[in-house]
Amino acid sequence: IVGGRPARPHAWPFMASLQRRGGHFCGATLIMGWGQLGTNRPLPSVLQELNVTVVTAGICFGDSGGPLVCNGL
């Protein structure tokens, strides 16, 4: 976004950041699960609350200089 400004956390709950290797590469908008938008019903503030553990593992981008060993070979 050009000329944008930082948003408060949770201010835009329908926006998503797709990330790869620890950095943002694409934005997304969540559009499913909001029910029937053509009615006069209020939109839910939370679609679904889920508590999960997310693990991000490091990636090796190079060789440490030592010999490569796999199963003792």
UniProtKB/Swiss-Prot annotation:
Protein name, entry field: Neutrophil elastase 2B
Coiled coil: none
Family: Belongs to the peptidase S1 family. Elastase subfamily.
Pfam families in UniProt: Trypsin (PF00089)
Gene3D superfamilies: Trypsin-like serine proteases
Catalytic residues as annotated in Swiss-Prot or TrEMBL: 64 (charge relay system)
Enzyme Commission (EC) number: 3.4.21.-
Principal EC category: hydrolase
Keyword set includes Protease: yes
Domain of life: Eukaryota
Segments passing through the bilayer: none
One term of GO molecular function: serine-type endopeptidase activity
A GO BP annotation: proteolysis
Role of this protein: May be involved in the degradation of connective tissue in chronic lung disease.
